[in-house]
Amino acid sequence: MQKEKLVYLAGPIDGCTYSGCTDWREYAIKELKKDNITGLSPMRAKEFLKEHPKLVDGISKHVLASDAGITTRDMWDVRRSDATLFNLLGAEKVSIGTMIEYGWASAFNKPFVTVMEKQGNIHEHAMIRRLSGYRVENLDEGLAVVRALFAY
């Protein structure tokens, strides 16, 4: 039996709307599933956050939204994934959590696919450029690279 193919779907959450955090991830999960690739969303099982207009640090007392809950599961997901897809499109402020996930993915030797504008993204930085094995300008291109990584 072939090992399940996992890709972690990283990107800004703090300061975004619930749908802003989930819509692109749900799309990616649906598209990757067509190729038997499982997308791991840090927003899974967090429907309780829908009631909030914007997601900000400390917004919920739910165990999955606690400091430990977020960090523990996200690190575990990055560690067990085979690749990471970072969607930084349209970011309005630096996503500290996503930058930490870049560090984890690097430490765990995961291939990086970064989806980011060619110019003007607030995350534009030498280390992000260096860590990004693949950099594309839209989500569909990013998903195509992920599929290519798993084409064996």
Label the model's feature ranges.
Residues 1-152:
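Conserved catalytic or regulatory cores that recognize and/or transform ribose-phosphate-containing ligands
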